[in-house]
Curated annotation (Swiss-Prot):
This is Non-structural maintenance of chromosome element 5. Keywords: Chromosome, DNA damage, DNA recombination, DNA repair, Nucleus. One of its GO terms (cellular component) is chromosome, telomeric region. The keyword Phosphoprotein does not apply. The lineage of its organism: Eukaryota, Fungi, Dikarya, Ascomycota, Saccharomycotina. It comes from Saccharomyces cerevisiae (strain ATCC 204508 / S288c) (Baker's yeast).
Length: 556
């Protein structure tokens, strides 16, 4: 993320608690009025067409007003698989263009990319600050307010699957028009002052501010992201996964701006924690509304993943955000069938992003302090997530969670989870507790290699007598998960210090030696059991990571 997005405040004029607020020029006021007028007439195709035609023409950025951003968010929920008749009625002459929902989503993604790049050489600085203001106004409107009851209070029933599906969306409560919408710009009339729904769907900001609906949206998205049921998967894949990714990015941008400009500098640690507890990400995670945050967060973020549920597990109820999302209209014909590999990759990437946002919040908490709300402690979250990952039954899902390409962006939490997960697995498979300091040693290649050598020689990555007591499949699964954790940590080691720092060092060669010898032991174990298939091997991957090709590490 470009620092200019956070630091640029040349045109900012704080108002009503919104430090980021930017006043309108006459030119932008005319554009805002025109877009709102088209929305009042439900001429959504023209709204989208106007915005689409602005891209790539010049350096002038067509700034989208925050109320139209909320309209685009809601339009994005109108996927044709369950709304095709309504979409056709609104846009009857569309025989070649994409649907309104896909066009709205693409526009949101394009504008978000411009916002994150914040390139003042490409666009006028005033336009960029005004665009930031509009997105921040929208995300502050979407932020769930404190409620008298929440999702966590709903009745939970015993279940073996971890999730219970309810068929219908929640009933929309009556709206108090005075409390539904407040336009900070009194120079024009917003369409949202007169409209609460878009083609039958209540405005997304109003829907998500209903009690329990914000967390239900997240759970509905995560649970359906791995579904085999076509309408449920489409609901997640076409609507809520891309929308939730946008929301997480916006909350992250808003958080950075809040810390930079809305928290007084040089305040005491106690006062800083108090302000941090009021920050956008804190409010975001407070929507979980639970006292036992670490365990419940782990349960929620891995909802519907394949892992061993605790014996006292209770099902988490979820329901459609909008009515009809769990059905397919007769006129819609699915054209794409996604593989389990694709589903796992997309689903686990989103879950990882959600976890990363939680750790981004926790990184700001000073040592010796804890957030007031939500009551999160970093060590508890690491342990809860690591415990769940260690109990995964699906190695594909496990790999897709850890094998990320964004090493730099996720370096502040993925190594901790890899080490924590490895520790939890070893706790279950070894006769003694193994204390790991691999993350501490990531900046010291020699110490890291020495620790790995010790773990390998202690048979932490070998098939042991305890493995023989379990089934072959379970033993192999545990070994594969241990291998993945080690490979993740090795990737970060090489990312942080570079291959050259330890290339051909005595400790590196000894580590490769120990791993190759360990692989030999795995083969002997499989041969002794007459299994026929080769067990998972670690050395071929590690040697490739360290650039060992023609070299041979001789086993004594």
């Amino acid at each position: 993320m470009d620092g200019a997005l956070i630091n640029s405040v040349l045109y900012v004029s704080p108002r009503n608690g919104a430090h980021y607020f930017v006043e309108l020029t006459e030119k932008h006021l005319l554009a805002f009025e025109m877009l709102n007028s088209m929305c009042l007439l439900e001429n959504y195709d023209h709204v989208l067409l106007f915005l689409e035609c602005q891209f790539g023409k010049s350096h002038n950025l067509a700034v989208i007003p925050f109320d139209i951003i909320l309209v685009l968010f809601t339009l994005s929920t109108l996927s044709e698989y369950y709304k095709e008749p309504i979409l056709r009625a609104n846009d009857p002459y569309n025989t070649s263009r994409e649907t309104l929902s896909r066009r709205a989503l693409k526009l949101l993604q394009k504008y978000l990319a411009i916002l994150k790049e914040f390139d003042s050489e490409q666009y006028n600085l005033y336009d960029l600050e005004l665009l930031r203001c509009q997105f921040f106004l929208a995300i502050d409107t979407l932020t769930p307010k404190k409620q008298k009851w929440g999702f966590d209070r709903f009745r939970r029933t015993k279940s073996e699957s971890g999730v219970t599906y309810r068929q219908n969306a929640s009933v929309d409560p009556e709206l108090d028009q005075a409390k539904t919408f407040k336009n900070p710009y009194r120079s024009y009339i917003s369409c949202l002052e007169q409209r609460n729904t878009i083609l039958g769907n209540r405005l997304l900001n109003l829907k998500l501010n209903e009690p329990g609906e914000f967390i239900n949206m997240i759970l509905w998205t995560l649970s359906n992201s791995l579904q085999e049921s076509t309408p449920l998967f489409l609901s997640s894949h076409e609507i809520w996964m891309p929308l939730l990714e946008i929301l997480i990015d916006l909350f992250s941008c808003r958080q950075d701006y809040f810390i930079q400009h809305e928290v007084a500098q040089n305040v005491s640690k106690s006062l800083f924690v108090q302000r941090l507890s009021e920050s956008p990400l804190a409010v975001f995670f407070e929507s979980l509304n639970t006292r036992n945050f670490a365990n419940r967060f782990s349960e929620y973020v891995f909802l519907n993943c394949d892992y061993k549920l605790p014996s006292d597990n209770y099902a988490t109820p979820v329901h459609p955000v909008y009515n009809g999302e769990n059905t397919i209209v007769d006129t819609y014909i699915p054209t794409i069938k996604c593989s389990p590999l694709y589903k796992s990759q997309k689903s686990l990437a989103l879950r990882r992003k959600l976890i990363g946002s939680c750790f981004k919040l926790l990184l700001r908490v000073p040592d010796g302090h804890r957030l007031i709300t939500p009551r999160i402690v970093a060590d508890d979250v690491i342990q809860g997530i690591s415990r769940t990952l260690a109990s995964f039954n699906d190695i594909l899902q496990f790999k897709k969670f850890f094998m990320t390409e964004n090493l730099s962006q996720e370096s502040y939490f993925i190594p901790l989870l890899a080490e924590g997960t490895l520790s939890e697995i070893l706790k279950d498979t070894q006769e003694c507790v193994v204390i790991l300091t691999l993350v501490e040693n990531l900046s010291d290649g020699v110490s890291f290699c020495n620790e790995v050598i010790g773990l390998v020689k202690s048979k932490c990555f070998a098939f042991t007598e305890q493995c023989s007591q379990a089934s072959y499949e379970e033993a192999v699964l545990n070994i594969e998960k241990c291998d993945v954790c080690l490979l993740v940590l090795l990737r970060y080691l090489l990312h942080l210090i570079g291959t050259e720092a330890i290339l051909d060092a005595k400790e590196q060669l000894e580590m490769l030696h120990a791993i190759e010898k360990n692989d030999s032991g795995r083969r002997q174990w499989a041969k002794a059991l007459n299994l026929g298939n080769d067990p998972p091997l670690l050395y071929p991957i590690v040697s490739q990571m360290f650039g060992v090709h023609d070299k041979s590490v001789i086993i004594e």
